[in-house]
């Protein structure tokens, strides 16, 4: 008798995506992050839903409502810290997922890669708006500084900023609309993630060797479900350790002070996962130039498939390309560190050097390394 999962239309869909899905037999733990990102998204939606039940999106009560959730709501403290630190875990998985795509050449699956970039933008927008909601000092001033960047747009900049703010400054209207978008975007992200999977299953997964997986495939269940569950346990171990032992480790102490438009914090900075882009923004003395550099630091991912001139898909057997890749990783870590430092010597200079190196590595060094390797292998 044919199992129900192969006959029922809905079960058949799940079966083809998660159970009988043909997967390459040699994919490593770096392929775990897709399922971990899905888990993070579900966790964020569930915890966010419970937080929204008690949160008040109003400038006069937002800060107090967050304190109320932490103090008075049953297990409110753990829901809040799971949501805040869950976002950090989300971005860690996201960066590792993109890093794996770059290293093993998964960007050659264009539709999947491009939807992934849209997903990254949507996730960054959601996280930014979520950071504004507690209405602490860093929430308020972070929102003011980042939204103010729109004023760099020629001619319509000022109108654009006031349109986003809903007034002449970040105020109640801004908070209300940010809460609205913060609530709706995760569902849009879920739809995009489904499309991401749909396009991935059209081509099948890449593998570490960067060769065709067609001759040697195994079913996703039980082999990779077990492997993914191990990754999930490790993720939950790190997340719960953070939540239970150091819930405020990745946050900013200034956010425990209620938003005050008359008092600017000594050093305004976004959450840690935006610091690399923030460092690039600050490295350009011109406002419009800084905004363009900020946008290009993410949009450059769109150009990666075009810049791929190597004859091999994966970097596994390309030592020169590996060198440029790890240079890029080190550079991004340096930018993240610089983004959290005050705007003074020597941090300004280090930030500028690291910003130039970031674009140089992707646009010049990586393609040159690939061409040299092609030449050495007589594949030109």
From Swiss-Prot:
Question: In which residues is heme b b562 bound?
Answer: 83, 182
- What more is known? Heme 1 (or BL or b562) is low-potential and absorbs at about 562 nm, and heme 2 (or BH or b566) is high-potential and absorbs at about 566 nm.
InterPro entries (UniProt xref): Cyt_b/b6_C, Cyt_b/b6_C_sf, Cyt_b/b6_N, Cytb/b6-like_sf, Cytochrome_b, Cytochrome_b_C_euk/bac, Cytochrome_b_N_euk/bac, Di-haem_cyt_TM
The stretch of residues making up the signal peptide is none
GO cellular component annotations, sorted alphabetically?
mitochondrial inner membrane; respiratory chain complex III
The record describes its quaternary structure and partners as: The cytochrome bc1 complex contains 11 subunits: 3 respiratory subunits (MT-CYB, CYC1 and UQCRFS1), 2 core proteins (UQCRC1 and UQCRC2) and 6 low-molecular weight proteins (UQCRH/QCR6, UQCRB/QCR7, UQCRQ/QCR8, UQCR10/QCR9, UQCR11/QCR10 and a cleavage product of UQCRFS1). This cytochrome bc1 complex then forms a dimer.
Originating gene: MT-CYB
Designated name of the protein: Cytochrome b
The positions annotated for binding heme b b566 are 97, 196
Q: Name one GO molecular function term.
A: ubiquinol-cytochrome-c reductase activity
Q: How is the cofactor bound?
A: Binds 2 heme b groups non-covalently.
Protein topology in the membrane: Multi-pass membrane protein
Kindly list the positions annotated as binding a ubiquinone: 201
What protein family is recorded?
A: Belongs to the cytochrome b family.
Query: Where does the sequence pass through the membrane?
Result: 33-53, 77-98, 113-133, 178-198, 226-246, 288-308, 320-340, 347-367
Q: Keywords of this protein's UniProt record, alphabetized?
A: Electron transport, Heme, Iron, Membrane, Metal-binding, Mitochondrion, Mitochondrion inner membrane, Respiratory chain, Transmembrane, Transmembrane helix, Transport, Ubiquinone
Listed under GO biological process in this entry are: mitochondrial electron transport, ubiquinol to cytochrome c
**Functional note:** Component of the ubiquinol-cytochrome c reductase complex (complex III or cytochrome b-c1 complex) that is part of the mitochondrial respiratory chain. The b-c1 complex mediates electron transfer from ubiquinol to cytochrome c. Contributes to the generation of a proton gradient across the mitochondrial membrane that is then used for ATP synthesis.
Q: From what superkingdom does this record's organism come?
A: Eukaryota
Q: What is the required cofactor set for this protein?
A: heme b
């Amino acid at each position: 008798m044919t199992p129900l999962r192969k006959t029922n239309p809905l079960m058949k869909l799940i079966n083809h995506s998660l159970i009988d899905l043909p997967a390459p037999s040699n994919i490593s733990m770096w392929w775990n992050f897709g399922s971990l990102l899905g888990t993070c998204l579900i966790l964020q939606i569930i915890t966010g839903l419970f937080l929204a039940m008690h949160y008040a999106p109003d400038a006069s009560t937002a800060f107090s409502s967050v304190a109320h959730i932490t103090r008075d709501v049953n297990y409110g403290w753990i829901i809040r810290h799971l949501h805040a630190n869950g976002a950090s875990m989300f971005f860690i998985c996201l960066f590792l997922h993109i890093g794996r795509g770059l290293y093993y050449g998964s960007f050659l699956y264009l539709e999947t890669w491009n939807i992934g970039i849209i997903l990254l933008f949507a996730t960054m927008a959601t996280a930014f708006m979520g950071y504004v909601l507690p209405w602490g000092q860093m929430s308020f001033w972070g929102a003011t500084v980042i939204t103010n960047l729109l004023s760099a747009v020629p001619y319509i900049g000022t109108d654009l900023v006031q349109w986003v703010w809903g007034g002449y400054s970040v105020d109640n209207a801004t908070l209300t609309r940010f809460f609205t978008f913060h609530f709706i975007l995760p569902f849009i992200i879920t739809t995009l993630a489904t499309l991401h999977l749909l396009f991935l299953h059209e081509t099948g997964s890449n593998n570490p060797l960067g060769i065709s997986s067609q001759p040697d495939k195994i079913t996703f269940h039980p082999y990779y479900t077990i492997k993914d569950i191990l990754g999930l346990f490790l993720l939950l171990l790190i997340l719960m350790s953070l939540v239970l032992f150091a819930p405020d480790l990745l946050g900013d102490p200034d956010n425990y002070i209620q938003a005050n438009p008359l008092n600017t914090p000594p050093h305004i900075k976004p959450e840690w996962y935006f610091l690399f882009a923030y460092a690039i923004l600050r490295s350009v003395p011109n406002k419009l130039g800084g905004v363009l550099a900020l946008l290009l630091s993410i949009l450059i991912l769109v150009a990666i498939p075009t810049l791929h001139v190597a004859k091999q898909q994966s970097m596994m057997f390309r030592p020169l390309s590996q060198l440029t890749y790890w240079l890029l990783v080190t550079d991004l870590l340096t930018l993240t560190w610089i983004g959290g430092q005050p705007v003074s010597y020597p941090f300004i200079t280090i930030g500028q050097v690291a910003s130039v190196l970031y674009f140089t590595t992707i646009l010049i060094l990586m393609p040159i390394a690939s061409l040299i390797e092609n030449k050495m292998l007589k594949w030109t």
